[in-house]
């Protein structure tokens, strides 16, 4: 309808063909696509340029308020601490019980391994007196020392038999001559004293020395056994009124005594001579073994001092003496 409103008699308006909106839109469009277009390339597809969006207005930073955690009450803290202590106590009790159980097991194992019933002297079960010592050469004595240790044990047995035969010889001598009653009484005393003393004073020390390689026990044996050899020589000589049936006593009965008594006394004198000879031989053998072990007198002194100071009896006596001296002052 606008075409009818125009005045056909008016001057015509100059129309610019380049002012057409469709033309201006094309001319204002970005020319990047034309610059990137290559008509000679294999693909004639134009590169699409993404349109960039303008950033929006910046928002002000807002600080979020921090929320404080709730503080525990004193009752809750005390309850938590008590619960922790209870847990620790239970753990300690459990560990203590476990340690006690292991210690008991170790003690039982050690008791089963080391505790042995005494077997010497070998007495019958009905006897009220029980064995006093444990003796086993195969388990306690090293293989290198078993033979010499057994020989010393056999020497002690020969020593006991000789003293018993000496008692019988002195009894026969007393029956043939009543003046020899003193010799018979002393022979009984020697048998009752020297038999156990020899076992305790020189045989047991050498047994302990070979068992544990103890220098102090070696020195005890050497001292006592040397005295024992001296006693053997006195006994084999047979001095009068000493309670021994030696060579002099046996020869004195040949003139005015029965022949049987003389023979018995000479046999006993031969036993004393045999004991003296075996004692010298075994003393030499033990000394050779002693030097082979590397023991010394200084080591024996150290073992003696350690044994003395570790003894409860010695410590008790020393403390009592010190207390008495302090009170006296």
UniProtKB/Swiss-Prot annotation:
The keyword Transmembrane applies. Residues 19-31, 40-51 have a biased composition (Polar residues). It is a multi-pass membrane protein. Residues 1-74 are annotated as: Disordered. Its main location: Golgi. It is found in: Golgi apparatus, trans-Golgi network membrane; Recycling endosome membrane. Residues 175-181, 240-262 are lumenal. The chain crosses the membrane at residues 154-174, 182-202, 219-239, 263-283. Keywords: Endosome, Golgi apparatus, Membrane, Phosphoprotein, Protein transport, Transmembrane, Transmembrane helix, Transport. The keyword Ubl conjugation does not apply. The modification Phosphoserine is found at residues 319-320. One of its GO terms (biological process) is protein transport. Pfam families: SCAMP. It comes from the Eukaryota. One of its GO terms (cellular component) is membrane. Residues 1-153, 203-218, 284-329 are cytoplasmic. InterPro entries: SCAMP. Residues 203-218 are annotated as: Interaction with SLC9A7. Functions in post-Golgi recycling pathways. Acts as a recycling carrier to the cell surface. Belongs to the SCAMP family. Interacts with SLC6A4 and SLC9A7. Interacts with SLC9A5; this interaction regulates SLC9A5 cell-surface targeting and SLC9A5 activity. This is Secretory carrier-associated membrane protein 2. It comes from Mus musculus.
